Amino acid sequence: MSEQKLALNEYLKTDSDYLRGTIKEGLDSAVTGSFSDGDQQLIKFHGFYQQDDRDLRNERKEQKLEPLYSFMLRARVPGGICSPQQWLGVDKIASTLTSSNSIRLTTRQTFQYHGIPKRNLKTIIQDLDREALDSIAACGDVNRNVMCNPNPVESKLHEQAYAVAKQLSDHLLPHTRAYAEIWLDEEKLLSTEDETVEPVYGKTYLPRKFKMAVAVPPDNDVDVYTNDLGFIAVAENGELVGFNLTAGGGMGSTHGEVETFPRLADDFGFIKTADVMKFAEAVMTVQRDWGNRVNRKRSRLKYTIVDHGYEKFKAEVELRAGVKFEPKRDVVIGDRGDRYGWVEGVDRKWHLTLFIESGRIKDLPGQTLQTGLREIAKIHKGDFRMTSNQNMIIAGVAAEDKATIEGLARKHGLLGQVLTQTRGHSIACVALPTCPLAMAEAERYFPEFIDHIDALQAKHGISEQAIVVRMTGCPNGCARPFAAEIGLVGKAPGRYNLYLGASFEGTRLNKMHRENIQEAEILAELDTLFGRYAVERDAGETFGNFTVRVGVVKAVIDAAKDFHG
């Protein structure tokens, strides 16, 4: 019987000499702005994707020119924390080495650059390195940027949780020296060509991307259940004692293919802080060994758990960790939004959360966000914290410095805008024109769409109710649309699938209500539902729970069985 053929990416990884491929040769070639097909997969492990301007694609084709290739580079910033000095370096790169002249905060607490010509890639990575930043494993079949609730109010508990997130990120980094050799001109050592180069990953790394998050209850801004692996902090008397571990979440799916589906993670039990690395490595290596390497659409950990079964997976993780799970501790998971404006922490320091629409930091007439953050960074003595809602926290401000920081924020349009509850809880992915997977607009259209939502809520007298709204240009789910009370997922230009019924806290998925509809139909549908919600809701009932209770959509209990059913 012939051996089952693996996905193409598996052969590329095996033959890449631990992610080197021919990236260096492709970088040196001035004949094209592109990398080879194989290297386009490998460069993801180095933190960037090849893209082109889709707005110009047809025009350039008519001119017999290759697409206007550029690159999106994503940094690795565990927990989203960087210093003001680092931010100044990040800002300078955006202003001098990218065509977008902007910084994009992501839904995973880091930043990315768009519009990088190939010739500038090495310079950018070297400039980031000078700021003690990198893009290693920000993309690819590895552990991605580790999220951690930025919770600056409970400073001691956050500090402890952040230390775990940082340790997870560092411990599970690829060991290959390919990044240092190609981008930082480190001298190449003789390749050992054995598994000791990557003691955790091996030559073929993971079957697919792997995402981790550390949540600090009651906040669930990191959407912990949407991650492959989650750690929900458990505290006693303000001290971190361990975590409830979750595994098997993930948002991506494919339109029309019912064997693919989003899924929220399962609860596995409580683990002590000292055992976090053992369990993280155990979960990752089970996925490494059991994950599907034949069909990449079924390669995420969520499918591994579904296919092998919860109990079998749990037993194998305990075996590899050498420790058994304890019963999960009772914790309360609550709001997924950010605390906007000034908040005082237990350490008497102040923290200013700034709303950044769709995470895009750019200077526009009347709203010079990029300049404003630059000016704040020049005088700020604390740190900058990126949130998973694509916002920025100016953290650790002394009381005597508040007025100066606030003055700069207001001067540059970072503060003072009218912000509804729903807009403050809503996010969108980048989509067009740069993302090659996008089928419809997201970031460019989303502010206008939220204007319509705000108007409908005002019409029905429900503006005080925060509703989690998310939009993506495709079903890959970068803005976690399947965990939104109202999720819009691009199907074609100007057309979206409308999903309803997720819980406000992020503990239940939504379900498709209408397929492939345009703005007018979406708004008409929501107009009717908001009208019903205004008069039929129970006290304190959220919109997502309402749509399930009154039968607009059925609750998704087991995504493998009922997300599509």
From Swiss-Prot:
List positions binding siroheme.
C478
Answer yes or no on keyword NADP. yes
What Enzyme Commission number does this protein have? Answer: 1.8.1.2
- Where is [4Fe-4S] cluster bound in this sequence? C429, C435, C474, C478
Q: How is the cofactor bound?
A: Binds 1 siroheme per subunit. Binds 1 [4Fe-4S] cluster per subunit.
For the protein in the UniProt heading, the enzyme class is oxidoreductase
- Name the Gene Ontology molecular function terms of this record: 4 iron, 4 sulfur cluster binding; heme binding; metal ion binding; NADP binding; sulfite reductase (ferredoxin) activity; sulfite reductase (NADPH) activity
Pfam families, sorted: NIR_SIR (PF01077), NIR_SIR_ferr (PF03460)
Q: Name one GO biological process term.
A: cysteine biosynthetic process
| Keywords (A to Z) from UniProt | 4Fe-4S, Amino-acid biosynthesis, Cysteine biosynthesis, Heme, Iron, Iron-sulfur, Metal-binding, NADP, Oxidoreductase
- Family to which the UniProt record says this protein belongs: Belongs to the nitrite and sulfite reductase 4Fe-4S domain family.
PANTHER family per record:
SULFITE REDUCTASE [NADPH] SUBUNIT BETA (PTHR11493:SF47), SULFITE REDUCTASE [NADPH] SUBUNIT BETA-RELATED (PTHR11493)
Oligomeric state and interaction partners are given as:
Alpha(8)-beta(8). The alpha component is a flavoprotein, the beta component is a hemoprotein.
Provide the function of this protein: Component of the sulfite reductase complex that catalyzes the 6-electron reduction of sulfite to sulfide. This is one of several activities required for the biosynthesis of L-cysteine from sulfate.
Q: What is this protein called?
A: Sulfite reductase [NADPH] hemoprotein beta-component
Please give the organism.
Shewanella baltica (strain OS223)
Gene encoding the protein: cysI
